[in-house]
Amino acid sequence: MILKHIKNAEAKDENKLALKANTIYDCIRDRFFISSPREEDTIDGRDPTLLISLLTAIINGKQLTAGNFGRGKTTSAEAIIALVHGIPCDATMACEARGDPEITKEEYIAIPDLTNMNNLLWRRFAQMPPKVFDEFNRMPSAKQSLFLDGIDRGNFEYMNQTLRAEPGPFYATMNWPDRGNVEILPPMLDRFDVSVITSAINPMYHKIMEEVDRSILEDGVIAAKMLAILDANGESYQKKIAELTELADAFRASISMQLGIGEGFTSKELATAREEIKNIEYADTGDNFKLFIRSETICPTHGEYMPGKACGGDCHWGSGNANEESRVGFAAITSPISERFFKSLSAYAKALAWYLNEKEVSKDHVRLVLPYVLWHRVQFAGDFMAGENKYRVGKQLENAKDFTKKIFNRFTEQEERINELGEALREPEDKNRKEHLAKARAFFAKIQKYANEYDHPIFAHALQMLGKQGSANESTDK
């Protein structure tokens, strides 16, 4: 498998760090995460659950993994953390939080130091950079807010003190609804960048599944040292992280050689990979597709709706005035779309482009990650896309995929016009605002023509913006 990637590297001048990520993916797929996705569900031939989980580890994202119990939600995260971040599985397990109706801050965030009441003893979960929260939806709604800021920004607070945790990936698992769990609140769901689903494996793989052995990803000696570092009282958090990093690099190098996947990542290489991903530019069509998606999240006529409502029959683009193929986002989705959504979409589209050794983020990279950034955040209108998958496990993800297909088709049908619009609205490199407005206003008549020919909110939004800017600019000139 490594030889295959080396040949690809020679043919495509492949990024060496992306090559390592591909090799780690193959290792986990072949040895620790057996799956059988349908071909139509794959991302460029790869299992989406495993691939997105790997990207989460690399970019320090926040991921919610849903599925029935016993489907490998937690163990897959532990294996990825071991290979990417160098934390043995037994150390990760000792630091995990677990959903509990009676959960308290003292269990997983901090406790007072009884020898010095001005001091706190921060819990392992709060300190360890890669975090796993098992069965997150076992917590009552009132308890979920205890972890809101920790998930969002890595800040853990207790008794007027704050621990700013070292950045790392955050994995939470969620079982499908049963008598023991509760609904995760929408603001909490919005904190998760992506969500994936683990499913039952094809029975024909039973022999392989029974032979999976992840003991190589454990190390009792290194795990004990890591836990001792986290439990040490009086040592600065920065020093603890430095000591953890040294142990993690040693463990990661050791298991990578044992598994035959080369040297694996070092901590410095992971930081470099994140910087490379951050600096990948969007191709114009990729950027324009993001703009197109954004234009479908708010109605140009009525603005934003309250949660639980979609733009209805009294709206020009509402549910009563559009067929299924042309029904835009705000008429199909009953949940508000936040700025976090677009940041998550951009981050994972960039990560996918980097992993696939592409130099720019295309519309296809955005399309491929969109369902996984969207489905856990939104509710679809009751009459929208129920269809044959109404009772299937993961129907929300299936609906998000259907929605993605339809919005992508709407974009590609008018791509040439939208690319023209994007070019007209794109700010020049010299940031000359007056020149930018003049260029956009010169395009105003063409936008009006497009708005009449192709009835889509993106043109209505553009006309509104240019009309207001034009009026403001004329007032200033006077």
Feature annotation, model-predicted:
Residues A97-Q127:
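Short glycine-rich substrate-engagement loop in P-loop NTPases that contacts/grips substrate
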